[in-house]
């Protein structure tokens, strides 16, 4: 379970980063 939790956390972090990056990109494009 420990390893699974770690993997899940890593995946969530990656998704969050991607979302932030996309938002920034959209903001830049808007400008």
From Swiss-Prot:
Residues 1-10, 18-31 have a biased composition (Basic and acidic residues). Keywords: Antimicrobial, Disulfide bond, Fungicide, Plant defense. Residues 1-31 are annotated as: Disordered. Disulfide bonds. It comes from the Eukaryota. One of its GO terms (biological process) is killing of cells of another organism. Heterodimer; disulfide-linked. Belongs to the 2S seed storage albumins family. Has antifungal activity against C.gloeosporioides but not against B.cinerea and Fusarium sp. or against various yeasts. Has no antibacterial activity. This is Antifungal protein 1. It comes from Passiflora alata (Winged-stem passion flower).
């Amino acid at each position: 379970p420990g390893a699974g939790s770690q993997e899940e956390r890593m995946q969530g972090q990656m998704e969050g980063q991607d979302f932030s990056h996309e938002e920034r990109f959209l903001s830049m494009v808007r400008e």
